[in-house]
Amino acid sequence: MKTGALATFLALCLPVTVFATTLRLSNEVDLLVLDGKKVSSSLLRGAESIELENGPHQLVFRVEKTIRLPGNEERLYISPPLVISFDTQLISQVNFQLPRLENEREASYFNAAPRLALLDGDAMPIPVKLDILAITSTAKVVDYEIETERYNKSAKRASLPQFATMMADDSTLLSDVSELDTVPPQSQTLTEQRLKYWFRLADPQTRHHFLQWAEKQPPS
């Protein structure tokens, strides 16, 4: 699909969805998986927030922050992948609150026993379950969707079984075939399904920036 047509398709053909919870993103949090689905980093890059429906949610992410070393040197600290589950049934906004991470000692403590909080719009703590996502794959590139699915099937602390099977059939990301003028090849269908899903979750400003970028791309 040509980029211009894709932008028009996203802007005009997506169904209107009513969301009730805003997840405020942090530049120190690298979001990897949301509710069992791999995050589209290209679409959400620079986004300040994404919109969620009320109900249970699960995030897989890493904390990334520059820390100080002896001798006034610095390095980028990247935490192990973390899983956090929570419920937004009566919550309109979710904000990350990270602990102090300024040096190697604090980073080591966080690696061993990660702790952080999610706050609502009134800065009140949201009940959460937090865990480390143990990676079972030996591949150089980790498929966090698969690792999250395995985690959710293992009855761990932050597991949400309802998200364990959602990636088995990506057709659930596409509400109806009638939304498309024609049915594209399967590989293209999967790509569009994922793009539509993350476009719908992005905040209005991010959608606007993405459409501007898409219009500037040369036809494929």
From Swiss-Prot:
UniProt similarity note: Belongs to the UPF0319 family.
Signal peptide: 1-20
Keywords of the record: Signal
Pfam families named in the record: DUF2057 (PF09829)
Keyword Chaperone: no
Protein name: UPF0319 protein YccT
Highest taxon, organism lineage: Bacteria
